[in-house]
A protein has these predicted regions:
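A C-terminal cap/extension of S-adenosyl-L-methionine-dependent methyltransferases
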Residues: 207-208, 219, 224-230, 238-302
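Conserved alpha-helix/loop element of class I SAM-dependent methyltransferases that forms part
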Residues: 48-71, 86
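A conserved beta-strand element that flanks and buttresses the S-adenosyl-L-methionine
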Residues: 143
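A short glycine-rich, Lys/Arg-flanked "PGG" loop and its adjoining helix->strand segment in the class I
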Residues: 155-167
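Class I SAM-dependent methyltransferase SAM/SAH-binding core
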Residues: 81-130
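N-terminal, positively charged/glycine-rich alpha-helical extensions of SAM-dependent methyltransferases
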Residues: 1-44
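Conserved class I S-adenosyl-L-methionine
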Residues: 70-79, 171-200
Length: 302
């Protein structure tokens, strides 16, 4: 396992030098904010929150927005405010703070929260500095969904998150999962072999082009053990809670037989797919975890 993790790190280091920045992540996410509706009222906003989470069965159980009553909550990488709405509707936090690199996302969050008669402290940070203008030890819960895998310097972000958390404070985070059908069935087989797209570039670079637009400057994926090691290096204690799977991945399941039968598909991917079994919900399991793209973790500051 350590050899595989070390190999992934070396590959990513090489890829980072080739990534198209086009003004950096902040500029990219301002131009390509996560898809949203033109919400007309609080009901349509809440329905969008519920609909979006339903696209990833199991996600909301792994990354809950309830049970945050009386807490100081930070949504790190809040985007257009989906989870800010979730916390404001399904919890009663003492204070709610949204942080993002995109001013457009923060402005959208403000307008969306206003539909609910709610507000939050909204803070723009610089992507290359990652400095959070909050006091050390002032936050109970940091929530970060689908953000750190886009960070140019995730270590700097983790260091700041650790600093602002109170002792015993919680950090719940979702990042893209290498051990997923998205990687082993969609990218490795459907995209590169069936369709013949991105088949001449490194696998991790092909993955990057499939998640948040083909020109997304940074989009890592991690094996759970690799991400645990990364975060624990910054003082956290925690665990891999499990993964949520996308409906898109579930729709691809019938292709698994052709993938296993393909001599063109590297053995790593064939073996991963051949180990699939199913849980009571009908979701594919590999290595005792749902083989979905959203890997979810829970950490605490000692």
């Amino acid at each position: 396992m350590k050899c595989v993790i070390s190999g992934l790190k070396r590959i990513r280091a090489g890829l980072r030098a080739k990534l198209p920045t086009r003004g950096g992540s902040a500029a990219y996410w301002t131009r390509h904010m996560v898809a949203m509706d033109d919400w007309s009222d609080s009901n349509s906003s809440t329905e969008h929150f519920l609909w979006r989470n339903a696209q990833y069965p199991g996600y909301i159980d792994l990354m809950p927005v309830s049970f945050a009553d009386g807490l100081v909550v930070v949504d790190y990488g809040c985007g257009p405010g989906n989870d800010l709405v979730g916390f404001s509707e399904f919890s009663k936090p003492d204070k709610l703070i949204g942080i993002d690199v995109s001013p457009t996302a923060l402005a959208t969050s403000k307008k969306r929260l206003a539909l609910h008669g709610k507000s939050a402290d909204l803070i723009q940070i610089e992507e290359n500095r990652n400095q959070i203008p909050l006091e050390s030890g002032s936050v109970d819960l940091v929530h970060s969904s689908g953000v750190l895998h886009h960070a140019e310097n995730p270590g700097a972000a983790l260091s700041e998150i650790y600093r602002i958390l109170k002792p015993g404070g919680k950090f719940q985070v979702m990042v893209y999962n290498y051990d997923s059908l998205w990687m082993h069935l969609y990218v490795a087989y459907v995209l590169r072999i069936e369709i013949g797209k991105h088949d001449r570039m490194p696998l991790l670079d092909a993955f990057r082009k499939t998640t948040d637009g083909p020109n997304c400057p940074i989009s890592h994926c991690y094996r759970p053990a690799e991400f645990l090691e990364l975060v624990q290096n910054y003082g956290f204690q925690g665990r891999f809670k499990g993964a949520a799977i996308s409906l898109f991945e579930l729709e691809l399941l019938p292709k698994r037989y052709a993938a296993i039968n393909s001599r063109a598909l590297p053995r790593e991917h064939r073996e991963f797919i051949s180990r699939i079994c199913f849980n009571h919900a009908g979701h594919p399991i590999v290595n005792d975890a749902v083989a979905g793209v959203d890997a979810c973790f829970e950490f605490r500051k000692p």
